[in-house]
A protein has these predicted regions:
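PLP-dependent aminotransferase-like
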Residues: 1-22
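Beta-loop-alpha module in the N-terminal Rossmann-like domain of NAD(P)-dependent dehydrogenases
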Residues: 16-24, 38-45
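ALDH superfamily catalytic-core signature
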Residues: 29, 33, 40-188
């Protein structure tokens, strides 16, 4: 989209990676600016390390993105937006919508039904497969952390509508894949 809007190729790059990848970017003389959205401890690390290396840094910590869905929302467009945001880049993107708040029970039921129907069609697989809709998490520690979040949600009383913990991709059984996972009735605490 950035290129279609007229931005020269290579000016904007989105990178998912571990500490080694982040440090490489933060220390590279070729990188002039960094923008980060994520946990507060990592945002602080990115800010301090980036500014120490004379970079312009925007680091937003503790960020979560919410979508409020009104009763007159277009169900297809809304679920497409949620799915693209939540599952694109295996959910490891700064603009992932992690919380959808539906106004009214009818709205919730329509969105929930369509969301479950559409996520069941997603093709989870390696990024090298053009047919994949979303890929694996980028390392074992993060994979285990995500599985732990799902366990915690269940233990805290959220209703698990779609459970991706036991997802296995044929030929990639040791990959860090988590299938579509959707909770309902999550308590705000």
């Amino acid at each position: 989209l950035a290129i279609e809007a007229g931005m020269p190729p290579g000016v904007l790059n989105v990178v998912n990676g571990d500490k080694e990848a982040v440090d490489t970017l933060l220390e590279s003389k070729d990188v002039q600016a960094i923008s980060f959205v994520g946990s507060t401890p990592i945002a602080e690390y990115v800010y301090h390390t980036g500014t120490k290396n004379n970079k312009r840094v925007q680091a937003l910590g503790g960020a979560k993105n919410h979508m409020v869905i009104m009763p007159d929302a277009d169900v297809n467009k809304t679920t497409d937006a949620i799915i693209g945001s939540a599952f694109g880049s295996a959910g490891e993107r700064c603009m992932a919508i992690s919380v959808a708040v539906c106004v009214g029970k009818k709205t919730k039921e329509k969105i929930k039904t369509k969301l479950l129907e559409e996520t069941a069609k997603l093709n989870v697989g390696p990024y090298t497969d053009e047919k994949s809709d979303f890929g694996p998490l980028n390392n074992k520690a993060h994979f285990e952390k995500v599985l732990g979040y799902i366990d915690t949600g269940e233990k805290e009383g959220a209703k698990l509508l779609s459970d991706g913990r036991n997802f296995k991709k044929q030929g990639y059984e040791n990959g860090y894949f988590v299938g579509p996972t959707i909770f309902d009735d999550v308590k705000p605490e």
